[in-house]
Amino acid sequence: MASSSHAQLEEIVRPTVEGLGFEFWGLEYHSQSGNALLRVYIEAEAGISVDDCAEVSRQLSVVLDVEDPISSEYRLEVSSPGAARVFFRYEQYQRFVGERVKVKLRQAFDGRKTFTGVLTATANEELTIFVDGHEYHLPYEWVDSGRVFPDYGA
């Protein structure tokens, strides 16, 4: 493979991660000035250890060398999504109902593009977020990015 897209990379990475008994949370691929980075996030009910990341990294390195989806040199990182995890798919929000989230929209809605508040529901491809005393119903198709936004001060 000469070039890579997120979909192509996921087709290669997901089965390897899941075959090792982990949940594939998502991936990021960035290439800037010849410095490319493939970051893969894995999850497990019992949590993720450094050894887990090393094991997945070793296996992915072999698979990626064979499949060769990235034509240039790149660095591979495998990690847990962490407490302030990024959401990659709508279904991932469902797990965090009741938690603080930060959602950025593609275009402004009600005078704002960023909504930081408590995720109160997910239904029908829509996120319901309670922000500053108001409940907002945001269609997922409007969402550009989202993440858990822990309140470390509480």
Residue map of PLM features:
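Short Lys/Arg-rich amphipathic alpha-helical segments
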Residues: M1-A154
